[in-house]
């Protein structure tokens, strides 16, 4: 009898200790013919995505990737060759085990020269602080994470993350491994999982997901910060050849979003005022000007982690770089480019 009981307890323990399906999933940007799916596992495994148009399982397609320790077990799958304006249903299998719930997304419609531009909804936010057991003493800053489910319930077409999307702590910003550990903990948070699969996500950064508070281009670990950002945010592009950073552009419907990097090339805030003192840098602003002139969008939304024009801001803002700010303002007035809007993060409500 004792042997039977031991066997029974062993069987129960084996069931209890069997690893559950464990992976973090986030939707990247979706265009008319593809969507980026980001997946992170807890070990090196094979990831398989089965995909088909919603309601048409006969047109099933398969995409595969492998997660590796050197990439923090994160993989980006480009689900390409899709049809415009189509809803898709997918299942992710990790090491042969399918996710408990299927995912869904839609490609952008092909509307040009055919119909009016489609209506769409954009959500945006910044400063996502999640409390940790080794945070400094005092009242915790993080909370009210029910906002993520509220956003997910609205099912926006696009979510713009405006920086400080994670907060590196002192033990973390000194290494790629530390930065990745913070990203991994936040991305796996239960509070974020529904939103991560509810819409397309595109991000920029600000100081706290770049390095220390108020960090700038002198931060010696900025290369590691950029590598971690690319690993966890599968934007369509990151910077330009020869000009590193997280800046780029995405288009949704008939609106262009210009994503700026206010950290990688930034001069220190306390640098003496001089013509060369810059927040964005000549190369990045040169690209922005060309892109604005080239854009045919009725609205052109310029996005950055810090405020552009609010002079009442006593903290970090573009007005601390008056030469660069004035040069951009003068250029915009001279060019008379219509429909330019500015969107920034870094403000806490």
Each predicted region: which residue ranges?
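Metal-dependent phosphoester/phosphodiester hydrolase catalytic core
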Residues: 21-349
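Bacterial N-terminal signal peptides that target proteins for export
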Residues: 1-9
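Bacterial N-terminal signal peptides
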Residues: 8-18
């Amino acid at each position: 009898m004792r042997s039977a009981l031991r066997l029974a307890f062993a069987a129960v323990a084996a069931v209890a200790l069997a690893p559950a399906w464990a992976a973090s999933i986030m939707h990247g940007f979706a265009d008319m013919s593809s969507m980026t799916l980001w997946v992170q596992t807890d070990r090196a495994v094979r990831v398989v995505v089965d995909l088909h148009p919603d309601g048409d399982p006969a047109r099933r397609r398969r995409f595969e990737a492998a997660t590796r320790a050197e990439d923090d077990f994160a993989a980006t799958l480009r689900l390409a060759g899709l049809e415009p304006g189509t809803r898709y249903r997918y299942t992710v299998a990790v090491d042969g085990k399918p996710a408990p719930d299927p995912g869904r997304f839609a490609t952008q419609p092909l509307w040009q020269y055919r119909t009016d531009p489609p209506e769409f909804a954009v959500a945006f936010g910044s400063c996502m602080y999640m409390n940790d057991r080794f945070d400094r003493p005092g009242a915790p800053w993080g909370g009210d994470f029910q906002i993520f489910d509220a956003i997910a319930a609205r099912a926006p077409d696009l979510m713009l993350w405006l920086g400080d999307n994670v907060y590196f702590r002192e033990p973390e910003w000194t290494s790629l491994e530390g930065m990745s550990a913070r990203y991994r903990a936040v991305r796996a948070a239960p509070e974020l999982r529904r939103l991560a699969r509810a819409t397309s996500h595109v991000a920029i950064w600000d100081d706290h997901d770049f390095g220390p508070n108020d960090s700038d281009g002198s931060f010696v670990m900025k290369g590691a910060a950029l590598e971690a950002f690319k690993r966890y945010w599968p934007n369509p592009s990151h910077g330009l050849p020869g000009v590193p950073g997280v800046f780029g552009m995405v288009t949704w419907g008939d609106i262009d979003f210009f994503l700026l990097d206010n950290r990688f090339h930034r001069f220190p805030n306390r640098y003496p005022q001089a013509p060369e003192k810059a927040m964005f840098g000549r190369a990045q602003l040169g690209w922005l000007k060309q892109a604005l002139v080239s854009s045919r969008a009725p609205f052109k939304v310029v996005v950055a982690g810090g405020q552009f024009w609010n002079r009442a801001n006593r903290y970090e803002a573009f007005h601390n770089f008056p030469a660069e700010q004035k040069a951009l303002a003068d250029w915009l007035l001279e060019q008379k480019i219509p429909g330019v809007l500015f969107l920034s993060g870094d403000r806490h409500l």
